[in-house]
Amino acid sequence: MTTSETGPILDPLEDLLDVLDLLPVGSAHITVDGPVADEGSDLGGSDADVFIGRSQPMPHGRVFGGQVLAQSVIAAGRTVEDLADAKERPRRIHSLHGYFLRPGDSNHRIRFAVERLRDGHSFSARRVHAIQFGK
């Protein structure tokens, strides 16, 4: 490991592994509003497990989408681990869909809110929101 004016520079592999080590920070309530014109169209909300992670430095200060997907998988996986017992096989990823609605800023942490949509006998479903600046 070497150092720079701003602090230690990690080996790229060490840095990637460090980025994937998310910090659990508790839970939050996520609400979903319907269209503004439709009165009473509030879609309700759900509770979510919340994790925080940082980004690898990237050109132009943007977050690499693959990093966000990997962090989302880690966050979702941490909400499934507690379901497995000694008799049950570990749950593996079967399907992943990602939508990038806004660019991310690599200089700010990302908050991952994981909604537990379903926990059945054979599979679980999760929705992960990657949030910066409240959006």
Say what each PLM segment does:
Residues M1-K135:
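Terminal targeting signals and extreme-terminal segments of soluble enzymes
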